[in-house]
Protein backbone atom coordinates (compact mmCIF):
# COMPACT_ATOMS: atom_id res chain seq x y z
CA UNK A 1 0.00 0.00 0.00
CA UNK A 2 1.37 3.46 -0.86
CA UNK A 3 1.97 5.71 2.10
CA UNK A 4 -0.19 8.83 2.44
CA UNK A 5 1.40 12.22 3.14
CA UNK A 6 -0.26 12.19 6.57
CA UNK A 7 1.21 8.75 7.37
CA UNK A 8 4.63 9.91 6.17
CA UNK A 9 4.47 12.94 8.43
CA UNK A 10 3.48 10.77 11.39
CA UNK A 11 6.49 8.51 10.74
CA UNK A 12 8.88 11.45 10.84
CA UNK A 13 7.32 12.74 14.08
CA UNK A 14 7.89 9.29 15.62
CA UNK A 15 11.46 9.19 14.22
CA UNK A 16 10.58 6.14 12.13
CA UNK A 17 11.83 5.50 8.61
CA UNK A 18 9.80 5.96 5.44
CA UNK A 19 10.91 2.88 3.50
CA UNK A 20 12.47 3.17 0.04
CA UNK A 21 9.42 2.13 -2.00
CA UNK A 22 7.13 4.27 0.16
CA UNK A 23 9.43 7.25 -0.42
CA UNK A 24 9.28 6.64 -4.16
CA UNK A 25 5.47 6.79 -4.07
CA UNK A 26 5.43 9.84 -1.80
CA UNK A 27 7.93 11.76 -3.94
CA UNK A 28 5.94 11.02 -7.08
CA UNK A 29 2.89 12.58 -5.42
CA UNK A 30 4.94 15.62 -4.38
CA UNK A 31 6.56 16.10 -7.81
CA UNK A 32 3.18 15.84 -9.54
CA UNK A 33 1.86 18.64 -7.31
CA UNK A 34 -0.63 16.37 -5.55
CA UNK A 35 0.52 17.28 -2.01
CA UNK A 36 -0.31 20.67 -0.48
CA UNK A 37 2.47 23.16 0.21
CA UNK A 38 1.73 22.98 3.93
CA UNK A 39 2.06 19.20 3.97
CA UNK A 40 5.23 19.27 1.84
CA UNK A 41 6.82 21.75 4.26
CA UNK A 42 5.80 19.63 7.25
CA UNK A 43 7.23 16.43 5.72
CA UNK A 44 10.48 18.14 4.70
CA UNK A 45 10.86 19.54 8.22
CA UNK A 46 10.09 16.15 9.78
CA UNK A 47 12.67 14.42 7.61
CA UNK A 48 15.30 17.03 8.47
CA UNK A 49 14.69 16.79 12.22
CA UNK A 50 14.59 12.98 12.13
CA UNK A 51 17.61 12.88 9.77
CA UNK A 52 17.09 11.36 6.36
CA UNK A 53 18.13 7.73 5.91
CA UNK A 54 20.00 6.16 3.01
CA UNK A 55 16.78 4.50 1.79
CA UNK A 56 14.79 7.72 1.97
CA UNK A 57 17.41 9.70 0.05
CA UNK A 58 17.84 6.96 -2.57
CA UNK A 59 14.07 6.68 -3.04
CA UNK A 60 13.67 10.43 -3.47
CA UNK A 61 16.64 10.60 -5.88
CA UNK A 62 15.15 7.80 -7.98
CA UNK A 63 12.01 9.87 -8.50
CA UNK A 64 13.93 13.07 -9.27
CA UNK A 65 15.79 11.12 -11.96
CA UNK A 66 12.46 9.86 -13.34
CA UNK A 67 11.11 13.40 -13.62
CA UNK A 68 14.27 14.93 -15.14
CA UNK A 69 14.96 15.79 -18.77
CA UNK A 70 17.67 13.28 -19.61
CA UNK A 71 20.82 13.82 -21.65
CA UNK A 72 21.23 10.83 -23.96
CA UNK A 73 24.87 9.72 -23.89
CA UNK A 74 25.93 6.53 -25.67
CA UNK A 75 29.41 6.14 -24.16
CA UNK A 76 29.80 6.54 -20.39
CA UNK A 77 33.44 5.40 -20.24
CA UNK A 78 35.63 7.82 -18.24
CA UNK A 79 32.60 10.04 -17.58
CA UNK A 80 32.54 11.92 -14.28
CA UNK A 81 30.50 14.58 -12.52
CA UNK A 82 32.29 17.03 -10.22
CA UNK A 83 29.66 18.50 -7.94
CA UNK A 84 28.99 19.84 -4.46
CA UNK A 85 25.91 20.05 -2.32
CA UNK A 86 26.73 23.70 -1.66
CA UNK A 87 25.88 25.23 1.67
CA UNK A 88 29.40 25.06 3.08
CA UNK A 89 29.49 28.85 3.50
CA UNK A 90 33.12 29.06 2.37
CA UNK A 91 32.64 31.79 -0.29
CA UNK A 92 35.56 30.43 -2.33
CA UNK A 93 36.08 30.77 -6.08
CA UNK A 94 34.44 28.05 -8.13
CA UNK A 95 36.90 25.20 -7.62
CA UNK A 96 34.78 22.42 -9.12
CA UNK A 97 34.14 24.37 -12.34
CA UNK A 98 37.84 25.05 -12.77
CA UNK A 99 38.61 21.39 -12.06
CA UNK A 100 36.13 20.44 -14.80
CA UNK A 101 38.33 21.98 -17.52
CA UNK A 102 41.44 20.36 -16.07
CA UNK A 103 39.84 16.92 -15.84
CA UNK A 104 38.50 17.22 -19.40
CA UNK A 105 41.97 18.14 -20.65
CA UNK A 106 43.22 15.03 -18.83
CA UNK A 107 40.89 12.80 -20.85
CA UNK A 108 37.70 12.69 -18.76
CA UNK A 109 34.23 13.35 -20.12
CA UNK A 110 32.85 15.76 -17.54
CA UNK A 111 29.06 15.84 -17.36
CA UNK A 112 28.63 18.59 -14.79
CA UNK A 113 25.26 19.23 -13.22
CA UNK A 114 25.00 22.63 -11.58
CA UNK A 115 23.05 25.71 -10.66
CA UNK A 116 23.45 29.28 -9.57
CA UNK A 117 25.07 30.18 -6.28
CA UNK A 118 24.06 28.52 -3.02
CA UNK A 119 27.04 28.95 -0.69
CA UNK A 120 29.78 30.46 -2.81
CA UNK A 121 29.74 33.96 -4.24
CA UNK A 122 29.63 32.27 -7.63
CA UNK A 123 27.86 28.98 -8.39
CA UNK A 124 28.96 26.88 -11.35
CA UNK A 125 26.33 28.46 -13.61
CA UNK A 126 27.40 31.97 -12.53
CA UNK A 127 31.06 31.10 -13.12
CA UNK A 128 30.48 29.68 -16.60
CA UNK A 129 28.42 32.71 -17.63
CA UNK A 130 31.18 35.01 -16.37
CA UNK A 131 33.61 33.04 -18.55
CA UNK A 132 31.39 33.66 -21.57
CA UNK A 133 29.76 30.24 -21.94
CA UNK A 134 26.12 29.75 -22.90
CA UNK A 135 24.64 27.66 -20.08
CA UNK A 136 21.00 27.28 -21.10
CA UNK A 137 21.46 24.43 -23.57
CA UNK A 138 18.89 21.78 -24.44
CA UNK A 139 19.66 18.12 -23.57
CA UNK A 140 20.69 17.22 -27.13
CA UNK A 141 23.01 20.25 -27.24
CA UNK A 142 24.61 19.20 -23.95
CA UNK A 143 25.22 15.72 -25.40
CA UNK A 144 26.77 17.32 -28.49
CA UNK A 145 29.08 19.53 -26.41
CA UNK A 146 30.10 16.54 -24.31
CA UNK A 147 30.99 14.53 -27.42
CA UNK A 148 32.89 17.38 -29.08
CA UNK A 149 34.66 19.07 -26.16
CA UNK A 150 34.59 16.53 -23.33
CA UNK A 151 32.43 18.91 -21.28
CA UNK A 152 28.68 19.05 -20.89
CA UNK A 153 27.13 21.47 -18.41
CA UNK A 154 23.55 20.77 -17.39
CA UNK A 155 21.85 23.81 -15.91
CA UNK A 156 19.65 22.26 -13.23
CA UNK A 157 16.43 24.31 -13.73
CA UNK A 158 16.26 23.25 -17.39
CA UNK A 159 16.66 19.57 -16.53
CA UNK A 160 14.39 19.44 -13.49
CA UNK A 161 11.25 21.38 -14.50
CA UNK A 162 9.15 19.54 -11.91
CA UNK A 163 11.19 21.20 -9.16
CA UNK A 164 9.10 24.31 -9.81
CA UNK A 165 6.38 22.57 -7.79
CA UNK A 166 8.40 22.71 -4.57
CA UNK A 167 10.40 25.88 -5.27
CA UNK A 168 8.01 28.25 -3.43
CA UNK A 169 7.94 25.98 -0.37
CA UNK A 170 11.73 25.67 -0.25
CA UNK A 171 12.14 29.42 -0.71
CA UNK A 172 9.70 30.25 2.09
CA UNK A 173 11.19 27.65 4.45
CA UNK A 174 14.69 29.04 3.95
CA UNK A 175 16.41 26.04 5.55
CA UNK A 176 18.21 23.00 4.19
CA UNK A 177 15.98 20.09 3.27
CA UNK A 178 16.42 16.73 1.57
CA UNK A 179 16.34 18.58 -1.78
CA UNK A 180 19.74 20.14 -1.01
CA UNK A 181 21.33 16.70 -1.08
CA UNK A 182 19.29 15.31 -3.98
CA UNK A 183 20.67 17.61 -6.70
CA UNK A 184 24.14 16.02 -6.84
CA UNK A 185 22.54 12.55 -6.99
CA UNK A 186 20.42 13.28 -10.05
CA UNK A 187 22.85 13.88 -12.93
CA UNK A 188 20.68 13.97 -16.09
CA UNK A 189 23.44 12.37 -18.18
CA UNK A 190 23.60 9.40 -15.83
CA UNK A 191 27.30 9.79 -15.07
CA UNK A 192 28.40 6.50 -13.45
CA UNK A 193 31.32 8.17 -11.66
CA UNK A 194 31.15 11.15 -9.36
CA UNK A 195 33.32 13.39 -7.19
CA UNK A 196 30.89 14.91 -4.70
CA UNK A 197 31.54 17.47 -2.00
CA UNK A 198 29.15 17.62 0.96
CA UNK A 199 28.41 20.21 3.66
CA UNK A 200 28.41 17.90 6.71
CA UNK A 201 30.67 15.01 7.80
CA UNK A 202 27.70 12.67 8.37
CA UNK A 203 26.90 12.90 4.66
CA UNK A 204 30.25 11.41 3.59
CA UNK A 205 29.25 7.84 4.39
CA UNK A 206 25.56 8.40 3.73
CA UNK A 207 25.93 9.82 0.21
CA UNK A 208 28.52 7.20 -0.76
CA UNK A 209 26.06 4.48 0.25
CA UNK A 210 23.16 6.22 -1.50
CA UNK A 211 25.25 6.27 -4.68
CA UNK A 212 25.99 2.59 -4.12
CA UNK A 213 22.25 1.89 -3.87
CA UNK A 214 21.56 3.98 -6.98
CA UNK A 215 24.01 1.89 -9.02
CA UNK A 216 26.99 4.24 -9.37
CA UNK A 217 30.23 2.57 -10.45
CA UNK A 218 32.75 4.75 -8.64
CA UNK A 219 32.46 7.72 -6.31
CA UNK A 220 34.44 9.89 -3.95
CA UNK A 221 32.33 11.81 -1.44
CA UNK A 222 34.39 14.40 0.41
CA UNK A 223 34.17 16.86 3.29
CA UNK A 224 37.07 19.02 4.47
CA UNK A 225 37.52 19.31 8.22
CA UNK A 226 37.62 23.09 7.72
CA UNK A 227 34.06 22.83 6.40
CA UNK A 228 34.82 22.90 2.67
CA UNK A 229 32.77 20.73 0.31
CA UNK A 230 35.93 19.92 -1.68
CA UNK A 231 39.18 18.11 -1.03
CA UNK A 232 40.69 20.79 1.17
CA UNK A 233 44.13 22.36 1.59
CA UNK A 234 43.29 23.82 5.00
CA UNK A 235 42.69 20.58 6.90
CA UNK A 236 42.25 16.85 6.47
CA UNK A 237 39.47 15.65 4.19
CA UNK A 238 37.09 12.83 5.06
CA UNK A 239 36.49 10.56 2.06
CA UNK A 240 33.82 7.97 1.35
CA UNK A 241 34.97 5.94 -1.65
CA UNK A 242 32.71 3.63 -3.64
CA UNK A 243 34.70 1.15 -5.71
CA UNK A 244 34.01 -2.43 -6.79
CA UNK A 245 30.62 -2.28 -5.08
CA UNK A 246 32.12 -1.52 -1.66
CA UNK A 247 32.27 1.69 0.39
CA UNK A 248 35.44 2.54 2.28
CA UNK A 249 35.90 5.59 4.49
CA UNK A 250 39.26 7.23 5.19
CA UNK A 251 41.00 10.58 5.57
CA UNK A 252 43.52 12.32 3.34
CA UNK A 253 45.73 15.39 3.84
CA UNK A 254 47.26 17.78 1.29
CA UNK A 255 50.78 16.69 2.21
CA UNK A 256 49.87 13.14 1.11
CA UNK A 257 50.03 14.57 -2.42
CA UNK A 258 53.04 16.84 -1.97
CA UNK A 259 50.85 19.92 -1.53
CA UNK A 260 51.40 22.57 1.16
CA UNK A 261 48.55 23.29 3.55
CA UNK A 262 46.80 26.62 3.02
CA UNK A 263 43.80 28.22 4.73
CA UNK A 264 40.58 28.51 2.74
CA UNK A 265 40.64 32.30 3.25
CA UNK A 266 43.30 32.38 0.50
CA UNK A 267 40.62 31.13 -1.92
CA UNK A 268 37.81 33.52 -0.99
CA UNK A 269 36.18 35.83 -3.53
CA UNK A 270 33.59 38.60 -3.26
CA UNK A 271 31.71 38.02 -6.52
CA UNK A 272 31.60 36.23 -9.88
CA UNK A 273 34.15 38.63 -11.41
CA UNK A 274 36.75 37.81 -8.74
CA UNK A 275 35.94 34.12 -9.08
CA UNK A 276 36.50 34.35 -12.85
CA UNK A 277 39.85 36.11 -12.37
CA UNK A 278 41.11 33.51 -9.90
CA UNK A 279 39.90 30.65 -12.11
CA UNK A 280 41.70 32.07 -15.16
CA UNK A 281 44.93 32.49 -13.17
CA UNK A 282 44.74 28.79 -12.32
CA UNK A 283 44.17 27.78 -15.94
CA UNK A 284 47.12 30.02 -16.88
CA UNK A 285 49.19 27.90 -14.46
CA UNK A 286 49.97 30.68 -11.97
CA UNK A 287 51.39 28.96 -8.84
CA UNK A 288 49.63 29.27 -5.50
CA UNK A 289 46.94 27.73 -3.31
CA UNK A 290 44.23 28.14 -5.98
CA UNK A 291 46.27 26.12 -8.47
CA UNK A 292 47.03 23.50 -5.82
CA UNK A 293 43.41 22.94 -4.77
CA UNK A 294 42.26 22.66 -8.39
CA UNK A 295 45.03 20.17 -9.18
CA UNK A 296 44.02 18.14 -6.11
CA UNK A 297 40.33 18.05 -6.98
CA UNK A 298 40.87 17.52 -10.70
CA UNK A 299 43.28 14.73 -9.79
CA UNK A 300 40.60 13.10 -7.66
CA UNK A 301 38.16 13.40 -10.58
CA UNK A 302 40.64 11.74 -12.94
CA UNK A 303 41.09 8.94 -10.42
CA UNK A 304 37.36 8.34 -10.00
CA UNK A 305 36.92 8.48 -13.81
CA UNK A 306 39.39 5.61 -14.15
CA UNK A 307 42.11 7.68 -15.81
CA UNK A 308 44.61 7.57 -12.93
CA UNK A 309 45.66 4.74 -10.65
CA UNK A 310 45.45 6.90 -7.52
CA UNK A 311 44.55 10.43 -6.49
CA UNK A 312 48.28 11.20 -6.38
CA UNK A 313 48.71 10.03 -9.99
CA UNK A 314 45.68 12.11 -10.93
CA UNK A 315 47.23 15.21 -9.36
CA UNK A 316 50.37 14.73 -11.48
CA UNK A 317 48.25 14.40 -14.61
CA UNK A 318 46.26 17.51 -13.65
CA UNK A 319 49.45 19.53 -13.15
CA UNK A 320 50.73 18.39 -16.55
CA UNK A 321 47.66 19.62 -18.47
CA UNK A 322 47.76 22.90 -16.55
CA UNK A 323 51.45 23.36 -17.38
CA UNK A 324 51.13 22.61 -21.11
CA UNK A 325 48.15 24.94 -21.60
CA UNK A 326 45.66 22.27 -22.61
CA UNK A 327 43.35 23.00 -19.65
CA UNK A 328 43.08 26.67 -20.69
CA UNK A 329 42.58 25.59 -24.31
CA UNK A 330 39.74 23.33 -23.20
CA UNK A 331 37.96 26.29 -21.60
CA UNK A 332 38.27 28.34 -24.78
CA UNK A 333 37.05 25.45 -26.95
CA UNK A 334 34.06 24.82 -24.70
CA UNK A 335 32.97 28.47 -24.57
CA UNK A 336 33.24 28.77 -28.36
CA UNK A 337 31.30 25.56 -28.93
CA UNK A 338 28.43 26.61 -26.66
CA UNK A 339 28.07 29.78 -28.76
CA UNK A 340 28.06 27.69 -31.92
CA UNK A 341 25.34 25.43 -30.51
CA UNK A 342 23.24 28.39 -29.42
CA UNK A 343 23.65 30.14 -32.77
CA UNK A 344 25.40 33.09 -31.16
CA UNK A 345 28.49 34.90 -32.49
UniProtKB/Swiss-Prot annotation:
Alphabetic keyword roster: Amino-acid biosynthesis, Aromatic amino acid biosynthesis, Glycosyltransferase, Magnesium, Metal-binding, Transferase, Tryptophan biosynthesis
Molecular function terms, GO-annotated: anthranilate phosphoribosyltransferase activity; magnesium ion binding
Disulphide-bridged cysteine pairs: none
Pfam family of the protein (one): Glycos_trans_3N
Entry similarity comment: Belongs to the anthranilate phosphoribosyltransferase family.
Pathway(s) where this gene product acts: Amino-acid biosynthesis; L-tryptophan biosynthesis; L-tryptophan from chorismate: step 2/5
Cellular component GO terms held in the UniProt record: cytosol
Name of the protein this chain belongs to: Anthranilate phosphoribosyltransferase
Gene for this chain: trpD
InterPro entries: Anthranilate_Pribosyl_Tfrase, Glycosyl_Trfase_fam3, Glycosyl_Trfase_fam3_N_dom, Glycosyl_Trfase_fam3_N_dom_sf, Nuc_phospho_transferase
Residues annotated to bind Mg(2+) 2: 229-230
Ligand binding (Mg(2+) 1): 96, 230
UniProt record, GO biological process: L-tryptophan biosynthetic process
Annotated binding of anthranilate 2, by residue: 170
Catalyzed chemical reaction(s): N-(5-phospho-beta-D-ribosyl)anthranilate + diphosphate = 5-phospho-alpha-D-ribose 1-diphosphate + anthranilate
Tree of life domain: Bacteria
Cofactor info, note text: Binds 2 magnesium ions per monomer.
